[in-house]
From Swiss-Prot:
This is CTP synthase. Its EC number is 6.3.4.2. Residues 291-542 form the Glutamine amidotransferase type-1 domain. The gene is pyrG. It catalyses: UTP + L-glutamine + ATP + H2O = CTP + L-glutamate + ADP + phosphate + 2 H(+); L-glutamine + H2O = L-glutamate + NH4(+); UTP + NH4(+) + ATP = CTP + ADP + phosphate + 2 H(+). CDD domains: CTPS_N, GATase1_CTP_Synthase. PROSITE patterns: GATASE_TYPE_1. SUPFAM superfamilies: Class I glutamine amidotransferase-like (SSF52317), P-loop containing nucleoside triphosphate hydrolases (SSF52540). The active site is at C379 (nucleophile), H515, E517. Allosterically activated by GTP, when glutamine is the substrate; GTP has no effect on the reaction when ammonia is the substrate. The allosteric effector GTP functions by stabilizing the protein conformation that binds the tetrahedral intermediate(s) formed during glutamine hydrolysis. Inhibited by the product CTP, via allosteric rather than competitive inhibition. Catalyzes the ATP-dependent amination of UTP to CTP with either L-glutamine or ammonia as the source of nitrogen. Regulates intracellular CTP levels through interactions with the four ribonucleotide triphosphates.
Length: 545
């Protein structure tokens, strides 16, 4: 199969939405029956985002095969059916690490290692390997044109266009077209300068996606086309919208998919966007609004919980409910008490690391349990629920996780020292292992217990969900917890690790060690989130029993 490439770059400012724009184009092309994949190239020196601060970088998205990747891969999976893998995201750090490994091994036969050709060749090889077996590969380069760290990536995609042929490659550039109220018009000069910068490194864009807070007039688009040497029909106006799921229709209406197919010589049926039309309809026509409290420690940057936010919205669509997320700092719960949690229809405690705010999360789980508020715990959210139950129901007053208190006499949560990874290999860890790349990662099999809420929600005896954790329930203390009423409703494939717990005498209290948010999509939703938001609606109406 011959693969065609669309390279996506950004200019003027960061955070223009390259990932959303690229994913929206991919969704349209997929709707035309084409096999599409996507890649994200990140110019930073970290090997992967696994150890980066969520408040700087946003969430770490975990793929089925256990790669810790950029949050844009979450957008890709929410817009297209293709599942991302470790091949779909790599960083400058990963590239340099591999080149240096090859140099130490002697693979370069004593050559002087340079950015060109060694670094650029490594980038090209990874792009080609990650795109095999697809009609179109859309490759997004992180950062902004002109950034010094992105230059090797820009040079690599320039070379790829030469090697693969311009008939098989396209460049799509996102740029800002600001509106100046004082002048009463949009200004195209920033776009012109951004394209000039791109052309100075040998890349002529074929498509310009022009971001603005309004529709860009036809005469301004013609002006951009003239000065940037781009066909007028390839200058796409992408205005701000109230839902990212409207963007596929927005750019299809301007014929971008037709332009791409014609350029690549691809004959494909018209895109069927009925599923996206249904998503937009459900989003625009909720029957009620529920308020869900998300109690976390990274709330100053909502993107730290991007997939959770989106999964809640998806579940709202399936229940015809608008979901209002109230972000609550777990440290505020510690300082101000339960008053921070009053008036919520449901409570969600997401994943996280470190001891800051941990007691606030434990108290949150207590409040939800005692007041019969629907509760969904994810990863750490399950562990704090377990700690709270052990302390206040099972009578283990000093129960804790060894992550936060290594000296606790009742470690209900401890470090996993051995497990089988997603490829079937045995992994071993100790307290002294590196932080990066040392967690239980990727899709894992989970067996669900008959008669449990989890089994009812999923409708299956076994499921696969994605993990990202290094601490797990201590099986030695499970008998005491189960005797006190704790329900274990999900176990790992070898039945050694607890995956899901449920609380007794509670209408809806489910907590999972895995991350269900990573597999939720706007078209399909996710059973755990759908059940959770449904329970929130019942709580709102006073119907939850």
């Amino acid at each position: 199969m011959t693969t065609n490439y669309i390279f996506v770059t950004g200019g003027v400012v960061s955070s223009l939405g390259k990932g959303i724009a690229a994913a929206s184009l991919a969704a349209i092309l997929e709707a035309r029956g084409l096999k599409v994949t996507m890649m994200k190239l990140d110019p930073y020196i970290n090997v992967d985002p696994g150890t980066m601060s969520p408040t700087q970088h946003g969430e770490v998205f975990v793929t089925e095969d256990g790669a810790e990747t950029d949050l844009d891969l979450g957008h890709y999976e929410r817009f297209i059916r293709t599942k991302m893998t470790k091949r779909n995201n790599f960083t400058a750090g990963r590239v340099y690490e591999e080149v240096l490994r090859k140099e130490r091994r002697g693979d370069y036969l004593g050559a002087t290692i340079q950015v060109i050709p060694h670094i650029t060749n490594e980038i090209k090889e990874r792009v080609i390997a990650g795109s095999e077996g697809h009609d179109i590969a859309i490759v997004e380069v992180g950062g902004t044109v002109g950034d010094i760290e992105s230059l090797p990536f820009m040079e690599a995609i320039r070379q790829l266009a030469v090697q693969k042929g311009r008939e098989r490659t396209m460049f799509m550039h996102l740029t800002l077209v600001p509106y100046l109220a004082a002048a009463g018009e949009v200004k195209t000069k920033p776009t012109q300068h951004s394209v000039k910068e791109l052309r100075s490194i040998g890349i002529q864009p074929d498509i310009l996606i022009c971001r603005s807070d309004r529709v860009i007039p036809a005469n301004e688009r013609a002006k951009i086309a003239l000065f940037c040497n781009v066909q007028e029909k390839a200058v796409i106006s992408m205005k701000d919208v109230d839902s990212i799921y409207k963007i596929p229709q927005l750019i299809k209406a301007q014929g971008l998919d037709d332009f791409v197919c014609k350029r690549f010589g691809i004959t494909a049926p018209e895109a069927n966007l009925a599923e996206w039309e249904q998503v937009i309809y459900e989003e625009a026509n909720p029957t009620d609004e529920v308020t869900i409290g998300m109690v976390g420690k990274y709330i100053e940057l909502p993107d730290a919980y991007k997939s959770v936010n989106e999964a809640l919205k998806h579940a709202g669509l399936k229940n015809r409910l608008s979901v209002k997320i109230k972000y609550i700092d777990s440290q505020d719960v510690e300082a101000k008490g339960f008053e921070m949690l009053e008036g919520l229809d449901a409570i969600l405690v997401p994943g996280g690391f470190g001891s800051r705010g941990i007691e606030g999360k434990i108290r949150t789980a207590q409040y939800a349990r005692e007041n019969k508020i629907p509760y969904l715990g994810i990863c750490l959210g399950m562990q704090v629920a377990l700690i709270e139950f052990a302390r206040n129901v099972a009578g283990l007053a000093d129960a804790h996780s060894t992550e936060f208190n290594a000296e606790t006499k009742n470690p209900v949560v401890g470090l996993i020292t051995e497990w089988v990874d997603s490829e079937g290999k045995v992994e071993e860890r100790t307290e002294n292992s590196n932080l990066g790349g040392t967690m239980r990662l990727g899709s894992q099999l989970c067996h669900l217990k008959n008669g449990s809420k989890a089994r009812e929600l999923y409708g299956n005896a076994s499921i696969h969900e994605r993990h990202r954790h290094r601490y797990e329930v201590n099986n030695n203390l499970l008998p005491q917890l189960e005797k006190a009423g704790l329900k274990i409703s999900g176990l790992s494939a070898d039945k050694k690790l607890v995956e899901i717990i449920e609380m007794p005498n509670h209408p809806w209290f489910v907590a999972a060690q895995f991350h269900p948010e990573f597999t939720s999509t706007p078209r399909d939703g996710h059973p755990l989130f759908e059940g959770f938001v449904k329970a929130a609606g019942q709580q709102l109406r006073g119907e939850l029993k």
